[in-house]
Amino acid sequence: MDIYDCILEKAKNANRAARTLSNMSTDIKNAALIKMAEELNKNKDDILKANMLDLEDAKSSGKNDAFIDRLTLNENRIESMASGLMKVASLPDPIGEVTRMWKKSNELNIGRVRVPLGTIGIIYEARPNVTVDAAALCVKSGNSVILKGGKEAINSNLAIYNAINKGAIEAGLPAGTIEFINMTERKAVEVLMKLNEYVDVLIPRGGSGLIKSVVENSTVPVIETGIGNCHVYVDSSADLTMAENIVINAKTQRPGVCNAMETLLVHEAVAEKLIPHLTETLSKMGVEIRGCLKTKRLIPDIRLATAEDYAQEFLDLILAVKVVSSLDEALDHIYKYGTKHSEAIITNDYTSSQRFLREVDAAAVYVNASTRFTDGEEFGFGAEIGISTQKLHARGPMGLNELTTIKYIVYGEGQIRE
């Protein structure tokens, strides 16, 4: 069977499963999620062996530390993925929820009800945890899912898929509920992006190249999960100890994720007090600093930042720094270089904070907190499928509700339209 026929068959299977899955009870879906968690833990050794193969290939091909971190699995991470499945099982089922009900003057009763999107394709890079997160959220929200992970994680993803799919089938979910594309050829993605008849939506999750390719080439509707060129702006009134703590957390806790800070903007009134000490601390933690001319005057040994640096999602221990003369200049910089993901201001000035909240166009905007909180778990949604930076159909962390659409139900007693 060639690539096209193989992907087409998987899409047909998933589409067929979606019809059955959309009408399955919450109890069956929850039982499946629990069984998937059990199988994940039961097959831990096989998954770790498969992950070692991927890690060896990644290291031999010179992948950076942030990439290796995203790819790495260990017992704790597998247990965390299993725990995530259990948490999703404990969340309220959005399917069938009546979000609004009203009666018209002609006695028609009209309701708006949550229903599944249908069949969802997830295209992602070297993030084995996405295999579990995506499957969990799709199952609970009554959607079938087609998973296409990056070739760098093919062994890990396949081992995870085999475990969770076994659990799903044994618990009574229809075959095809979770499909996995184990082909690494580029054509596999190209085929998936054109299967409008069987796939309702595609969600790409990864770097800018992947997302751009899917958005530009897919005929299937796309929910764009975001590139995270996130900024922290330290205002003239900021508590500098708080600013240091937030900046260090936002940059170094997990530099390889989309809600990590990539650019630090500092008001010139506090630049001399903040930048030398903060950048010394960051440098000791392995962060490379690239700054504007004003920053370089304060710390001469750094590399001069370019426009490309300010536009870059580094996903690494690299930080671009710029000294600005005002909140206006900070807002202009974010408007020019931001990716509508997560932006933060550190300030003790109420007027500045409210202006920042109003004027910054992003999925999540923070006052005196780290950008690292843009996450489904941290927002209380449970697991997430990704962070949407577009405005249709969803924005921000995408949990269960964001994987549904609406259906109008209308009760009548023989009414006809005049």
UniProtKB/Swiss-Prot annotation:
SUPFAM superfamilies for this protein: ALDH-like
Gene Ontology molecular functions: glutamate-5-semialdehyde dehydrogenase activity; NADP binding
PROSITE patterns, alphabetized: PROA
EC class (word): oxidoreductase
Domain of life: Bacteria
EC code(s) of this entry: 1.2.1.41
A Pfam family it matches: Aldedh
InterPro entries: Ald_DH/histidinol_DH (IPR016161), Ald_DH_C (IPR016163), Ald_DH_N (IPR016162), Aldehyde_DH_dom (IPR015590), G-glutamylP_reductase_CS (IPR020593), Glu-5-SA_DH (IPR012134), GPR_dom (IPR000965)
Sorted UniProt keywords: Amino-acid biosynthesis, Cytoplasm, NADP, Oxidoreductase, Proline biosynthesis
Catalytic function, reaction form: L-glutamate 5-semialdehyde + phosphate + NADP(+) = L-glutamyl 5-phosphate + NADPH + H(+)
Listed GO CC annotations: cytoplasm
GO biological process: L-proline biosynthetic process
Sequence intervals crossing the membrane: none
Protein family membership: Belongs to the gamma-glutamyl phosphate reductase family.
Protein name: Gamma-glutamyl phosphate reductase
Gene, per the UniProt record: proA
